[in-house]
């Protein structure tokens, strides 16, 4: 096997491993700061599932520079239920020396089919936010 063939074989293997790291049954998130038209890197996202009358923490991740978290609960297998993502926004704006109204944003949603991928984006400004189920 020549050097180029070996390089391409290793690259293909690495890409396959990387692509399969996040399962289909997962929750991802994306935070966009619409006040500046940019991704919001460094925002902590806490993930919870409701069990009986309590919330059990299943993950804690920070958005990357591109504002994304590929998998908010990598150590938890999704099951049908009610979930909550808490986007901790105050430190993000404090680091920018910007006053904000919301110290955090909670998004509560139901998962009925735990085999699907769920994407929960948040568009954010110091004075408001919006969220939706993405793809």
Curated annotation (Swiss-Prot):
Keyword Coiled coil recorded: no
Domain of life: Eukaryota
EC number in record: 3.5.2.17
Entries under PROSITE patterns matching the protein: TRANSTHYRETIN_1, TRANSTHYRETIN_2
GO molecular function: hydroxyisourate hydrolase activity; identical protein binding
SUPFAM superfamilies attached to this UniProt entry: Transthyretin (synonym: prealbumin)
Residues engaged in binding substrate: 30, 68, 132
Signal sequence extent: 1-20
BP-aspect Gene Ontology terms: purine nucleobase metabolic process
UniProt KW keywords: Hydrolase, Purine metabolism, Signal
Alphabetized Pfam families for the sequence: Transthyretin
Catalytic activity: 5-hydroxyisourate + H2O = 5-hydroxy-2-oxo-4-ureido-2,5-dihydro-1H-imidazole-5-carboxylate + H(+)
Top-rank EC class of the record's enzyme: hydrolase
Subunit structure: Homotetramer.
Miscellaneous remark of the record: HIU hydrolysis also occurs spontaneously, but more slowly.
Family: Belongs to the transthyretin family. 5-hydroxyisourate hydrolase subfamily.
Function (record text): Catalyzes the hydrolysis of 5-hydroxyisourate (HIU) to 2-oxo-4-hydroxy-4-carboxy-5-ureidoimidazoline (OHCU).
Name this protein carries in UniProt: Probable 5-hydroxyisourate hydrolase R09H10.3
Source organism of this protein record: Caenorhabditis elegans
Organism phylogeny: Eukaryota, Metazoa, Ecdysozoa, Nematoda, Chromadorea
């Amino acid at each position: 096997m020549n050097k180029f063939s070996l390089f391409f074989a290793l690259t293909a293997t690495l890409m396959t491993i990387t692509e399969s790291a996040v399962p289909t049954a997962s929750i991802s998130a994306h935070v966009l700061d619409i006040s500046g038209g940019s991704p919001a890197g460094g925002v902590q996202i806490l993930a919870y599932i409701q069990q009986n009358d309590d919330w059990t923490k299943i993950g804690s991740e920070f958005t990357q520079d591109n504002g994304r978290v590929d998998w908010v609960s990598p150590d938890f297998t999704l099951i049908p239920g009610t979930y909550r993502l808490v986007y901790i926004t105050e430190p993000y704006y404090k680091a920018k020396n910007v006053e904000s109204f919301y110290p955090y944003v909670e998004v509560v949603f139901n998962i009925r089919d735990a085999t699907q991928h769920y994407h929960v984006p948040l568009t954010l400004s110091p004075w408001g936010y919006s969220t939706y189920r993405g793809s």
